[in-house]
C-alpha cells in the first residue's frame, strides 16, 4: 500500500484546520534514527484503505520523492463524523 505525502511547513491549529478543509489531514512520522517529520495526507485516499487489514501492517509513504516504510501507531477520529483528524506513523 502506497500513499503520497507532503511535508507540512505550517504548524498549529489554524494550519491543521485549513488542511482539513482542503481534503487533507495532518500526520507525523517518527521513530528510528531520523528526526520526526510532520506531513499532510489526502483524506479520501487513506480513509478508503483503512478498512483493509493490510493498512495496519506496513505502508509505504512517499514523502517528497523519498519512500519510507511505516506502520500506523495512532489514529485520532472525529467524534461523530467518519473523518480522520490526525495520524501517527512509526518507521519500520
UniProtKB/Swiss-Prot annotation:
Family indicated by similarity: Belongs to the bacterial ribosomal protein bL25 family.
Protein name: Large ribosomal subunit protein bL25
UniProt xrefs under Gene3D superfamilies: Ribosomal Protein L25, Chain P
GO terms under biological process: translation
Assembly description: Part of the 50S ribosomal subunit; part of the 5S rRNA/L5/L18/L25 subcomplex. Contacts the 5S rRNA. Binds to the 5S rRNA independently of L5 and L18.
An MF annotation (GO) of this entry: structural constituent of ribosome
PANTHER family, per database record: RIBOSOMAL PROTEIN L25/GLN-TRNA SYNTHETASE, ANTI-CODON-BINDING DOMAIN-CONTAINING PROTEIN, RIBOSOMAL PROTEIN L25_GLN-TRNA SYNTHETASE, ANTI-CODON-BINDING DOMAIN-CONTAINING PROTEIN
Keywords noted in UniProt: Ribonucleoprotein, Ribosomal protein, RNA-binding, rRNA-binding
Name of the encoding gene: rplY
SUPFAM superfamilies: Ribosomal protein L25-like
One GO location term (cellular component): cytosolic large ribosomal subunit
Function: This is one of the proteins that binds to the 5S RNA in the ribosome where it forms part of the central protuberance.
Pfam families (UniProt xref): Ribosomal_L25p
Amino acid at each position: 500500500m502506497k500513499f503520497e505525502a507532503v511535508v507540512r511547513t505550517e504548524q498549529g491549529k489554524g494550519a491543521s484546520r485549513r488542511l482539513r478543509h482542503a481534503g487533507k489531514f495532518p500526520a507525523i512520522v517518527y521513530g528510528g534514527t531520523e528526526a520526526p517529520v510532520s506531513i499532510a495526507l489526502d483524506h479520501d485516499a487513506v480513509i478508503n484503505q483503512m478498512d483493509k487489514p493490510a493498512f495496519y501492517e506496513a505502508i509505504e509513504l512517499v514523502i517528497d520523492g523519498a519512500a519510507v516504510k511505516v506502520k500506523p501507531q495512532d489514529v485520532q477520529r472525529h467524534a461523530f463524523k467518519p473523518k480522520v483528524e490526525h495520524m501517527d506513523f512509526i518507521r519500520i
